[in-house]
Amino acid sequence: MNNTLMQAKEQFAQHELAGSLQTVNLVISNDQANGEAYLLRARIHYKMQQWGEAMNDYGSVLEIDPANQEAKSGIEMAKNILGYFAPDMFNP
């Protein structure tokens, strides 16, 4: 595993969300096919309640690994949250 990604995971585990986000962005900028990095960034966005960004990153994970269950669940949970907060968005 990439040392920078390990650092981002450690920051995330210590609830340093902004630092973890910045670090994982470096990983993704150097390796856009790193599904593990997108998954971590999705988790960070989810914890920061940035639902759209989380869904985008979960979608990127699914492009790389279509069978990833965490990404599928994450998208559904974010959709449910958005549906609760903004029902007009899905039911015009």
Cite the ranges covered by each PLM segment.
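Canonical positions in the second alpha-helix
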Residues: 26-27, 60-61
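Helix-start (N-cap) detector for alpha-helical repeat units in TPR-like alpha-solenoids
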Residues: 1-2, 35-36, 69-70
